[in-house]
């Protein structure tokens, strides 16, 4: 008798997920999933709820309808942070600390990826030589790169990336795609919102298109 194949559950799954603000629908209901090694590119016009969706998944907003599962198990709002690393529009950095101090501080709060160190993460994102530079002295693009270094150090298997290509030049855009691809090869997954022309999807990418609520 041939034993049935046991497939792993999705790293993230959402069922009947919807969000409203002031009784006005923002998105949903949505059903989608993301497997390990896969990216989901979330597209839609301004106002379609892309940022709101990622903030709901990250637990930054309370959702009144639907279910979110991690590895096949229901995940409450407060339990999802260790599984997810969120990169939003604001870098969330300490302006009066150096780049290296920021990374050490954040690693102390959230841990870090095995075999990765803050100094090497700065080199990966093109900030070698800026270890002692204060964040408030950095350009917008350099701050984005520092936020990407923090993302790279995160041990979380699921990345939630809200417009990660913003404030980056072509080299920076290539860097983001390389990082996402490496994360997927390591068994991670990513949700990426974008409407940019340079958002070349990494391997194993599916699309989720949000429509502006009528």
Curated annotation (Swiss-Prot):
Q: What superkingdom heads the lineage?
A: Bacteria
Q: Which GO terms describe its biological process?
A: cytochrome complex assembly
Q: Does the keyword ATP-binding apply?
A: yes
Please name the InterPro entries in this protein's record: AAA+_ATPase, ABC_transporter-like_ATP-bd, ABC_transporter-like_CS, ABC_transptr_haem_export_CcmA, P-loop_NTPase
> According to its UniProt record, which reaction does this protein catalyse?
heme b(in) + ATP + H2O = heme b(out) + ADP + phosphate + H(+)
**Which keywords appear in this protein's UniProt record, sorted alphabetically?**
ATP-binding, Cell inner membrane, Cell membrane, Cytochrome c-type biogenesis, Membrane, Nucleotide-binding, Translocase, Transport
Q: Which residues bind ATP?
A: 44-51
One cellular component (GO) term of this entry: plasma membrane
Q: Which family does it belong to?
A: Belongs to the ABC transporter superfamily. CcmA exporter (TC 3.A.1.107) family.
Q: What is this protein called?
A: Cytochrome c biogenesis ATP-binding export protein CcmA
What phylogenetic lineage does the species belong to?
Bacteria, Pseudomonadati, Pseudomonadota, Gammaproteobacteria, Lysobacterales
Q: Quote the gene name from the UniProt entry.
A: ccmA
């Amino acid at each position: 008798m041939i034993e049935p194949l046991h497939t792993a559950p999705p790293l993230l799954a959402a069922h009947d997920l919807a969000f409203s603000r002031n009784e006005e629908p923002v998105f949903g209901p949505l059903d989608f999933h993301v497997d390990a090694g896969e990216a989901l590119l979330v597209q839609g016009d301004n106002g379609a709820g892309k940022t709101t969706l990622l903030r709901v998944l990250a637990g930054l907003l309370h959702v009144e309808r639907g279910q979110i599962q991690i590895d096949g198990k229901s995940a409450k709002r407060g339990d999802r942070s260790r599984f997810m690393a969120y990169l939003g529009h604001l870098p969330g950095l300490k302006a009066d600390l150096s780049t290296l101090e920021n990374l050490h501080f954040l690693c102390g709060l959230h841990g870090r990826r095995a075999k990765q160190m803050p100094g090497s993460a700065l080199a990966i994102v093109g900030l070698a030589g800026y270890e002692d530079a204060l964040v408030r002295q950095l350009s917008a693009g350099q701050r984005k790169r520092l936020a990407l270094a923090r993302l790279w150090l995160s041990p979380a298997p699921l990345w939630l990336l809200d417009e990660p290509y913003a404030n980056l030049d072509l080299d920076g855009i290539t860097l983001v795609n390389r990082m996402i691809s490496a994360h997927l090869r390591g068994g991670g997954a990513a949700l990426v919102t974008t409407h940019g022309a340079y958002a070349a999807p990494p391997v194993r990418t599916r699309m989720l298109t949000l429509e502006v609520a009528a």
